[in-house]
């Protein structure tokens, strides 16, 4: 396995400017390109209070189910008042979700390890599992591929309440086991298949919910790294969050304005906000009979219109004290809750997160925080040996394949195989035959005008015969050049499937099945660097 790098620009202007080190002080509190950024952050953390003992006690209890000494050792480090954490998060996707989830976790672990050594303090990796997220349509599938087909979405055939959180949505064991079999049936059987499949099913049997299944698989993959999993949908953590819920309530109007003002600033700078903010949103969810509902503001009170529920500020404050497990964060308040709970040295962010965190600087300031340094996660493409060989054979630069795919190159190659004169001759034939046929039609209509429909049908039939000739020739070219054309398709499917980055479509199970556990052990210990270069892992 070999690690190389490429310089690939982000298509998001805001993200690229951030990566390039342009002045973004209007959007972020720390300059991640500054040499003393980590010392500054540690200094700021030293004056910020954290309920370290309570957090460690909760996490220690929650992690007992993983039976991991490394996890517990990381949790114990959090009790040290000098310790800090590198944090990142993602939804609880089936079979761990797209590859970028794995890449984000590796980013968290690598940066935590690097900073622990550089700063000589305990730095722990924490992965924030979005268990309170209720958009299950985003996590209930994986993509698979066969030799003759590109990516196919394989969705878990299970019905569920639309607004139930991932942490509380039970998996149908029978349906999920059958679905896993279908996913693995799409893989080529290898020496690793049976062991991997049985391990995945073992994790499933020990799971009740989407989040359980996700966490057990992640804990298994990163069992030696001391990765701490923080499930935002677990009722146990809500007691620790109560104080922040109440602060969000207290400053609710100002919070909505802070986000709106920051988004206006972003637009004025020529960038595009992505958070859908509304001055009537309370930026919190409320759980009622297993479903999540957005709390809104109306005429000075807090309401859930679908349920006809209303609270005054004082009533909601008391309810938060008594039933914190009923409340959860949205895209605006989740980062604030993270800052409240965890002594965060750095936040590992994907491109979309970099954009929307830039919309929250004033929200952080309002709540008395400085936004943690936001570090772009590692962008990784896995280059399999047979794909690298095909790139060389077809003389395709790897950067071209990653940035643009090979579909356009396939089309160009195919067009070049069509005889130069064939297309023009066919167009001439269609035009000339139509001209002659039109004269014949005109003469025939002089005999009987009612022949018009029949004559038009005859003209169309003749043109169809010419199209048949054209299709026959192109089909023969496809058959003749099929081997080469399939090479272009294989490269596209591997490196830029569905026209998207590899990490957004493919799942780690394909690689674990094909290359085995040693592949993953080597992969996660590669010397990745945070130089904002695209990482190429050659197998």
UniProtKB/Swiss-Prot annotation:
Q: Does the keyword Acetylation apply?
A: no
User: Keywords in UniProt for this one?
Assistant: Coiled coil, Ligase
Protein EC? 6.-.-.-
Record's superkingdom?
A: Bacteria
Instruction: Name one molecular function that GO assigns to this entry.
Output: ligase activity
A Pfam family of the record is: Rossmann-like_BshC
Which EC class is this protein assigned?
Answer: ligase
Coiled-coil boundaries: 455-475
Q: Which InterPro entries match?
A: Bacillithiol_biosynth_BshC, CC_BshC, Rossmann-like_BshC
Q: Which family does it belong to?
A: Belongs to the BshC family.
Q: Which NCBIfam families match?
A: thiol_BshC
HAMAP family linked: BshC (MF_01867)
Q: What exactly does this protein do?
A: Involved in bacillithiol (BSH) biosynthesis. May catalyze the last step of the pathway, the addition of cysteine to glucosamine malate (GlcN-Mal) to generate BSH.
**Could you identify this protein by its name?**
Putative cysteine ligase BshC
């Amino acid at each position: 396995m070999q690690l190389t790098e490429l310089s690939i620009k982000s298509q998001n202007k805001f993200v690229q400017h951030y990566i390039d080190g342009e002045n973004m002080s209007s959007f972020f509190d720390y300059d991640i390109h500054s040499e003393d950024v980590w010392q500054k952050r540690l200094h700021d953390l030293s004056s910020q209070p954290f309920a370290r003992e309570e957090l460690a006690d909760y996490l220690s209890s929650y992690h007992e189910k993983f039976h991991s000494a490394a996890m517990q050792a990381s949790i114990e480090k959090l009790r040290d008042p000098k310790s800090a954490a590198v944090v990142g998060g993602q939804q609880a996707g089936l079979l761990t979700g797209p590859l970028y989830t794995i890449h984000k976790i590796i980013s968290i672990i690598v940066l935590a390890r690097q900073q622990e050594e550089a700063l000589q303090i305990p730095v722990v990796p924490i992965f924030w599992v979005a268990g309170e997220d209720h958009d299950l349509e985003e996590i209930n599938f994986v993509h698979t591929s066969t030799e003759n087909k590109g990516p196919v979405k394989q969705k878990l055939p299970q019905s569920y309440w639309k607004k139930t959180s991932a942490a509380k949505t039970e998996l149908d064991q029978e349906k999920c086991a059958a679905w896993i079999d279908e996913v693995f049936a799409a893989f080529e059987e290898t020496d690793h298949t049976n062991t991997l499949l049985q391990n995945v099913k073992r994790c499933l049997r020990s799971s009740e919910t989407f989040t359980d299944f996700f966490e057990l698989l992640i804990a298994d993959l990163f069992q030696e790294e001391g990765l701490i999993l923080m499930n935002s949908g677990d009722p146990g953590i809500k007691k620790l969050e109560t104080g922040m819920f109440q602060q969000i309530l207290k400053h609710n109007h100002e919070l909505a304005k802070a986000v709106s003002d920051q988004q206006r600033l972003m637009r004025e700078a020529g960038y595009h906000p992505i958070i859908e903010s509304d001055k009537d949103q309370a930026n919190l969810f409320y759980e009622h009979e297993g479903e999540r509902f957005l709390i809104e503001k109306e005429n000075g009170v807090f309401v859930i219109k679908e349920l006809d529920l209303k609270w005054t500020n004082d009533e909601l404050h008391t309810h938060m004290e008594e039933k914190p497990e009923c409340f959860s964060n949205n895209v605006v308040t989740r980062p604030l809750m993270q800052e409240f709970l965890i002594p965060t040295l750095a936040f590992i962010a994907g491109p979309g997160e970099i954009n929307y965190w830039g919309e929250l600087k004033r929200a952080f300031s309002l709540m008395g925080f400085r936004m943690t340094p936001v570090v772009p996660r590692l962008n990784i493409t896995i280059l399999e040996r047979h794909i690298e060989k095909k790139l060389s054979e077809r003389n395709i630069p790897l950067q071209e394949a990653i940035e643009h795919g090979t579909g356009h190159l396939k089309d160009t190659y195919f067009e070049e195989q069509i005889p130069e004169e064939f297309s023009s001759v066919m167009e001439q034939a269609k035009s000339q035959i139509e001209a002659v046929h039109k004269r014949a039609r005109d003469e025939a209509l002089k005999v009987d005008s009612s022949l018009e429909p029949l004559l038009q049908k005859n003209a169309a039939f003749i043109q169809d015969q010419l199209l048949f000739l054209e299709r026959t020739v192109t089909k023969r070219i496809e058959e003749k050049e099929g081997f080469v054309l399939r090479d272009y398709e294989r490269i596209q499917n591997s490196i830029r499937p569905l026209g998207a980055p590899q990490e957004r479509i493919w799942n780690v199970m394909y690689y674990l099945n094909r290359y085995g556990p040693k592949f993953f052990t080597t992969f996660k210990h590669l010397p990745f660097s945070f130089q904002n270069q695209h990482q190429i892992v050659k197998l």
